[in-house]
Amino acid sequence: MVRSLKPFLALVLAVGFSGLAQASDNSEPQKPAASLAERTQSMHHLPGLLPLDWDAKTGKLYLEVPLTGDTDHTRSADYLFADSLPYGMGSNDIGLDRGQVSEGRLVHFERTGPKLLLIAPNSEFRTTSTEPAAQLVVAQSFPSSVLAGFKVEAESPDGAVLVDATDFFESDVHHVAEALAGTGQGAFRIDAARSTIALDGTKAFPKNTEVEAELTFAAQGEVSREKAPFVRDVTPDPRSITVREHQSFLELPPPGFTPRRFSPRAGYFPTMWRDYDVPLGESLDQQFIIRHRLIKKDPNCTHACVAVSPIQYYVDRGAPPLMREALVEGARWWDQAFQTAGWAPGTFRVELLPADADPMDVRYNMIQWVHRYTRGWSYGSAIADPRTGEIIKGNVTLGSLRGRQDYLIAEALTAPYTKGKPLPDAAHDAALQMVLQRIRQLSAHETGHTLGLAHNFAASSFPHNPDQTVSVMDYPHPWITVSADGVPDVSHAYPVGIGIWDKVAIDYGYREFDRDGKPVEDAPALDKILRDSEKTGLIYITDEDARPQGGAHPHAHLWDNGMDPATELDRVLAVRSAALKRFGENTIREGTPLSQLEDTLVPLYLFHRYQAEAAVKEIGGLDYRYDVRGDGQMTPKIVAPADQRHALASVLKTLSPEALTLPESLLGLLPPRTPGLPRTRESLPAHTGLTFDPIGSAESAADLTLTLLFNAERANRLVEYHARDSAEPSLDDVIQATLKATGNLADAQGLTGEVKRAVDSRILEALLALAANPTASAETRGTVRLTLQSMRGDLARESENKEGQAFRADELARIDEFFRDPAKFVPAKPIPSPPGMPIGEEQ
């Protein structure tokens, strides 16, 4: 067959090349590109890394690209490219905040004839081999991305080309339309007629070029309250959303930065790429930490060393004065950690942004103040060189609603507004001082992320000392005490200064080791830093282990305190009880609608929610570390049976009708919502229409505990751990203790009785949900079904009162519904609670 194809192929090739030659002969000779200088002589020129030319007559922005990356003038140098959002949407749910930045990408320009392409090479897959063939294999095995294509409009004798980049700069590089669609707000598309280059944000400098565009996104369909609620919350015309997007081209940092290997014990974010030429037996994945560049002026210095270029951060001038001061002070704490790592005072600096500086200039490390419609997270991010992990720009986003939520929490705890007493000044306002404590800590926390640090959610398990911070990289719950006369004290809610763990982490990431006058890596010295820390009892556990509801680690939690989560839960419940006894009109200011008492009540009524979550994780818990072979750390250990039972006893107190029933003296103060102040998702649930619902509130609080306690993963572990050691509590032990603690079969009267029955109903629903959960093991489901059968027999007995009879009838009906067809049973959803996280902030 191959032989018979040869004449045919020869004919095809001959015809093909003949056709190509004929086409070439008939084509017009290509005209040389116009002179760049001539083409731009009437335009406004912005010299810089990539020069810009603005044509005011046509509204077009031209980009000059020097093709100096090769001798043929077909390739540019490599640049770092990033995008950001100088004007955001102010919606926490959509997540497009003012000042938001992307990650940095490596890019370059390539010319082919009249085309210029902007290309992002694939930096995720690399080789350290110097062999051209090995490098070609990697390059050809994975795709690159062409980000944009341009037509060459003119060129200069030195190889620079001019392109019309207007369409590119007016494109949706920040993926705003994608974010809108992803949050269910509908389809939006850029309307070119209502979009333009924003000249006030477009600048060029020797080491970076900045271009900003004002973009209008037009709705492509209906934008009703039901279909686009978040857009309607924040936009004058929800069919037309106008924001600004910003693009930055940066010169790559010079040589001299030494990447530092990532360790799971050190508390950093990793940057990772694959090296396909490492020896067999070694990991393909090459992991390094992200960090700023710090180099000693004197390589021989070992203490209080002066940096060639200190790390400089700037705080947004738009924050209110008191907040600005707190932001600056908190971020400056990091200098303490750098001094521990061998650097001189002032190596880490924080100042107010100069009045004439542009916060979107990628050269500035920024702490920005951001407004949103509802509460949401603050966060720290960074633009880093993907080749090395070197941080080029740190960017902190701090939500302005943080302080207002913290102030609300302090008001609920302290009930500060005594009738006839004037409001205190700032220095004597306990709530305000608590807010400023928190803002300082928050500024330090988010700045820590921009230094490369991850969360350490186990820091709060270190012995508590009000005068000592363990880590600002934890999520702190306010440490509130109660005086001898029953008054909550918020004066020491948050400690001052950088933490013990934070100093360890900075020591690992930023201490410079030198040999022969040059920075080097010293693996034994880095390992010693971590070993010395581990000997003190410090633990590092981060998000993956702390956030899941089914998490097993007994020390890694969000918004908790104390070495013993169960003991601390008992203490927090006592603080809550003391504050509830004092709660009344004196928690709101004179002239405030009384219905706002309900808003102030929410964070106090649910004050225990996160400490309860911490205590729950001891049940079916496993204590472990991020072990590396040879590091000497402990091996995993199941939480001791006594500790699990202590935790269970404390957790079950959160289901107590006595804890969840509000007194009549308080209920009598709560009117229906005032016109203009409707309930929101921040309100406690109500099944009673306009009036406050104390039973619905209790159901909601109970479900917070029950969802955690009867999580399928936790239940499965209880089964496993009891099988491995019969001294460990079994799943049945936990179920029976829960039923006994709440008095499931007791018939009580009054509001306490209704709350008791409501909680009992939620317990049943939690058990039914676990029995029907496909992720629960067969043993877990079987254990729960045996319990349900036993409950059915007990519920069939007559009650002493009508309320009890009605409750039992409903419970029996639900159990019968389940057993009729377990595969088709639909568990009731948990009663929604107001969002809690973050403490004193958004989302």
Question: Where in this protein do the model-derived segments appear?
Answer:
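Bacterial N-terminal signal peptides that target proteins for export
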Residues: 1-9
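Auxiliary tRNA-acceptor-end handling modules of aminoacyl-tRNA synthetases
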Residues: 25-319, 337, 344, 352-405, ...
